[in-house]
Design a protein with these regions (language model features):
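Alpha-helical bundle segments enriched in helix-capping/polar residues
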Residues: 1-253
Length: 253
């Protein structure tokens, strides 16, 4: 009897072992628009035969992929987020503010040590900077929440990318997948780890003592959000390739 491609008890249901929404969507696309070129078919078969022998790799890939319960909109949301304009980094006032505040504080401390001005002047300026930082708290908190959600997705993907980076590849398709995620000097997983580090540093603003001290010295949270926006600008063009690499590896596994 005929076997349906999609739906209950379908071909897709029987062969689908993907662990990400990216891989599931790609596998469905492959079944819906099958290859007709002989060389392309043989090339994909070669990649599948190679992965069939790598049981540990496939099992670890699946386990890591299932740690995050993704949704169908993840890919579009990540790409839209990567293309979204920077709020603080594009504004010269915000870029200069941490430098100006830091410079003024250093100057005041130096003058106070030299006995030219009383130390209370530094204390008053520091308090002014702390209160001024409250003007940006709401906007930065909203951005922190958005970036945190994206990082949750990217952190899972970083583990999958690291597996791909460390796995020896022989077939042309698998080698191409490796090329999509960077070279030894700058890997995709390392780049995402850098974002994770920046986000962890920004999370220190939840500590009231650190928040007041560092913002009073050089508007620390603005400096951090500018660095995070810089990361997004630097890797926005790379993100679609990373997602494509994960999707292909997941569908092939």
């Amino acid at each position: 009897y005929d076997l349906d491609v999609f739906g209950p008890h379908s071909l897709f249901q029987y062969i689908n072992r993907t662990c990400t929404q990216l891989g599931k969507s790609l596998l469905a696309n492959w079944l819906g628009t099958h290859l007709e070129n002989k060389k392309e078919i043989e090339s994909r078969q070669e990649a599948i035969r190679e992965l069939a022998l790598e049981l540990n790799f496939r099992q670890e890939f699946r386990i890591l992929g299932l740690l995050y319960k993704g949704k169908a909109a993840d890919e579009d949301e990540l790409k839209a987020w990567a293309k979204s304009p920077s709020v603080f980094r594009k504004n010269i006032f915000f870029r200069m503010l941490p430098l100006l505040a830091g410079g003024i504080n250093i100057l005041c401390i130096a003058l106070a040590i030299a006995g030219i001005i009383p130390l209370t002047v530094f204390g008053i300026l520091w308090l002014c900077f702390v209160f001024a930082s409250f003007c940006f708290t709401s906007k930065i908190t909203k951005m922190q929440a958005v970036y945190g959600k994206k990082l949750q997705i990217l952190a899972t993907y970083a583990n999958l990318l690291r597996l791909i980076e460390n796995q020896p590849m022989k077939s042309p398709i698998l080698k191409e997948v490796r090329e999509w995620i960077g070279d030894e000097k700058q890997t995709a997983s390392h780049s995402i780890q850098r974002l994770s580090k920046l986000m962890n540093e920004l999370d220190q603003r939840n500590n009231a003592y650190i928040y007041a001290t560092l913002n009073g010295l050089f508007f620390w949270e603005i400096r951090k959000i500018i660095q995070i926006e810089g990361w997004k600008e630097q890797y926005a063009s790379e993100l679609p390739r990373w997602l494509t690499a994960i999707a292909h590896m997941d569908a092939l596994c």
